[in-house]
């Protein structure tokens, strides 16, 4: 039934009769009486309100508290509920997911369906929510016109009654369901009742990697339209080849009763007018009668018309400069009186694939994208405007220009905000059948064709007026079948202005204009059966392949991950047809739960008693659930930044800056530079940045490098900031940065022996603070007995155990400084990437954690092989050898040489040999538990945020200071975290460590991180745990289910050496 037809008289079926049909188990029944899809309507009754986007009096929200009753299956619902509320009904907010209000449980699964796989059947025990609400209408709404109800999102299927009469049925959780209520309304109070089913045959098409929840989770509203009204509006822009002029094409359809469609006296009495505004300036206007040119031998459309307005020198829309016009479409009667008006933001932009490149307005675009689920930790899938805007601002601030709506059409407001703030959008149909075997089983089944097709066609019909949408997607992980080919052709016919992408079937079928693989690697082929994933460099060079490649998913950001991300961006900038991709994904999909004491925590799969579940696999975000950043977000920001830097010379000091902006000039950018010596500023300056799009410019910063006043590393830091605030960023927002280590001019030390020694022995630079005339005092004392070796200097005493060979205690003024002795450390608390798909019921022998377990890395037995003491003239030296074995097989050999000097320093040289049979260890380092707890940590090295050997592009060498608690990254699933690399000096309380090392420091031991399932369960331990690594394996991140650490970041050598110098300032 079309929206042009009045609801006919129908025999009212009882609730049991309706339910007995089991429409929710018939894929060929997706709706009853649902109106056709169209762009959002407001039905303004004056042009100015439409042009200024004022709230429309013709809309009435039904959001708020509804009456709610919960049942375990639809057949349990009493028949009289359709007419009156049940006694046990409770209030429930709309929009909301009922699982977050004490009914039923949310379920998190990735691939596995949460119900037995028997399509189209679903379980008889099918949780059912019964909603109802009373409302009253303006008397004018009842006097004339049509009143419709709009549900923007209901999961997964629902029936609707109004005043006890059945209205209709709908499924597809992520697109609006709209019904004409006019025949059912009455004066005074009206009651609507909605029966929502958790599972339907549509659930087999909604197998996305997300929390499975139910209810009316998007807005509900009433809309009043005139009897004769605008039924559909399609807006397109066409730019001239030189982009100097454009045509605005508007196709508008009018609702006219079917019996009058062929009456020219009726149809010819209506006119359509389009006005195009730029702010308050009317740019163009056109008015013409209803009707089109003849379409075929039967004639024209009499209920629609096409209007084309020519615009000279249009301001173009892009994510960089999202200039929007406003098109007001008015329906006029024969007296030229306004019947109603609709209005839409219009962006003049062209999307095309030309010569193998995706181009926006003629420019090849580099997609700086991210996948985003609609998720909020408290409200689940019910998202408000504040949350939508928060995500957009964060994305823009961190150099994202694109977002993929994974994996369903989003809330209508999302697209309006992306239009206005500037983000390119891949709009994706609500289709995923990942749990089917094969995935294409349903897409090749004709009985499912209508269910598939409505999810694609209705998405396009709702969203096609948005300039932000540059690509349509047929869905996600649903294989490749005949249905996909048909829907690809439908889109290309109905919207030739946008390309279509679809990853299923290998990312390179005829149903996609873009090669859009997921998790293809930069240089490594993955020759999977049927659907091989070639390296992205290889893929674009395959014979007869000319399409651009944009990764629909890459860089799986699960927990402490994102290693090797910079490699992708090196490739993107090197190979033109590698045009970026969409990171997986934006936000950790954790929900707020409460423990037995009512305290909140972030939960993941299984925490609600949900089965089946995929545990913490829902947490792959660049941001935590509350949108605070993961360290990986900074890595993405830096890799994707729009300015690239190169150092041309040091005398004079000249750099080159290239703008990767395609359309905007750098009219709000200031270049700041600073020459740093060991973290201290030696010379600095700033100047405006004046760069045209896609241009480069040299900047002369200084005539020569500054004269050094002490030895150390010299660095040049540059950054670009925006002096003025923008719609998406505050003033002084940092948008780009870079750093180079400079050649060091010869430092001429004084004749003082201490300075000279420091110059030629950089590892002793921590001693430069000693006054020049300070005299060495007191000799070192050595004491030995059968159990201990003690080295004493002034108030300090180092005590070794002869049994273990370890430094068992460090005394200062008779106070013990160590709670656990200093010892080797070769393991880390496993990362999600280390674990991969390995779990208790499914062991993956290729996972790093399983290889380490099998080798005995977590159960190493240590033996002291030898212990030697030498009392030299100015120092004491203790040499110890340690052997590590598992099941009597030697695996590691560690040789430590401790040197104690008359400055109270302990220098340790460590040499580690690794058996060739042992898998590469996670780290080569040492750890101990310090008795002290200091409020701050101060270091000279890479920072300020967490960084790892394969994730340090965004980190900078400098002098940093942070509170102790900020040295721990609170990943929801605890793991190794908090490392800072390439450190030369660490100060913690009275402790000073120097050398060249990585370190991590926190209140939690590696052992506690290994055995604790959730962040909130971690208990601060006594003292402080200090991890010092000479070497640390990368974290990986190409994906999280197979080993993805690149070979350069794996500890594959047989021997490793490092040196650390410790001192306690008494």
Curated annotation (Swiss-Prot):
Biological source species: Yersinia pseudotuberculosis serotype O:1b (strain IP 31758)
UniProt keyword terms in alphabetical order: Glycosidase, Hydrolase, Magnesium, Metal-binding, Sodium
Cofactor remark from the record: Binds 2 magnesium ions per monomer.
Active-site residues annotated for this sequence: 477 (proton donor), 553 (nucleophile)
PANTHER family per record: BETA-GALACTOSIDASE (PTHR46323:SF2)
Binding site for Mg(2+) 1: 432, 434, 477
Pfam families, A to Z: Bgal_small_N (PF02929), Glyco_hydro_2 (PF00703), Glyco_hydro_2_C (PF02836), Glyco_hydro_2_N (PF02837), LacZ_4 (PF16353)
Binding site for substrate: 110, 209, 477, 553-556, 620, 1041
Protein name as annotated: Beta-galactosidase
Annotated binding of Na(+), by residue: 209, 617, 620
Enzyme class: hydrolase
Any Gene Ontology biological process: lactose catabolic process
Catalytic reactions on record: Hydrolysis of terminal non-reducing beta-D-galactose residues in beta-D-galactosides
